[in-house]
A protein has these predicted regions:
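Short, acidic/polar
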Residues: 12-24, 69-77, 138-148, 193-200
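Structural motif
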Residues: 27-28, 54, 81, 152, ...
Length: 234
């Protein structure tokens, strides 16, 4: 997979999701889609299968975090959905990440890409220290989680675009960085605290960017998506 824009389908129902996707019916480039907790928990595996049937790649964003055996079994179930990327929390430890990778790998050796979440882009230094009692600088925490994920055999991490370049320096250029917290220069940052524009994310080395409301809530979602692709992929 090359650089791509992943559109966060943060909708509550199949109807709302397909009302959005229908706007892209005439587009040659089918958006890579992120299905998160709200939509997956509302509609279940059926929504994944229906979207795949339309020809979209899918990042199933459920952020698993539990004891290793539970995560292994859950990943085994997810491996049957034919998604392209899925993820977990790096804070679950190396043992959990290794178990997840084992569960996700199919009998023929194939599997979706497995990505670790480091620190959410809604987390800043103050909230990390006060709420999580983590005193280390946030960029060092991200680097530590990235190193643990790489040593566990994962394909990359979700991180702020502010950390993408440092992650590649630490873990190698082939270790993928998927970066939310991307907004247009003239857009609202919403509840994200560590943000960057698509062009800046490209310059710093992000492999994928995840964009939600700047596209899904735009007056013209197709134009917003194409603008994002032009800034990041072209």
């Amino acid at each position: 997979m090359g650089k791509d824009v992943i559109v966060a389908c943060d909708f509550a129902s199949t109807e709302a999701t397909f009302a959005f996707l229908d706007k892209f019916a005439d587009c040659q480039r089918k958006p890579f889609l992120k299905i998160g907790m709200e939509l997956y928990y509302a509609e279940g595996p059926a929504i994944v299968k229906e979207i795949k049937a339309r020809g979209h790649k899918i990042f199933l964003d459920l952020k698993l975090h539990d004891i290793p055996n539970t995560v292994k079994k859950a990943m085994n179930v997810l491996s049957r959905l034919d998604v392209d990327i899925t993820n977990l929390h790096a804070a679950g430890t190396k043992n959990m990440m290794k178990a997840a990778l084992e569960g996700l790998t199919r009998p023929d050796g194939s599997r979706p890409l497995l990505i670790a979440v480091t620190q959410l882009t809604s987390t800043d230094q103050e909230s990390m220290e006060n709420d999580l009692l983590i005193r280390e600088p946030i960029d060092e925490v991200v680097m530590h989680y990235a190193q643990c994920a790489a040593e566990s055999g994962l394909d990359g991490i979700v991180c702020s675009p502010l950390e993408a370049g440092k992650v590649h320096d630490r873990c190698g250029r082939n270790f993928l960085t998927i970066t939310p917290g991307v907004r247009f220069a003239d857009g609202d940052v919403g509840d994200q605290k560590r943000v960057m524009t698509p062009a800046a994310a490209k310059a710093i080395g992000s492999d994928y960017i995840v964009v939600g409301r700047p596209i899904t809530a735009a007056a013209d979602p197709v134009a917003a998506y194409e603008r994002c692709v032009a800034e990041f992929c072209d």
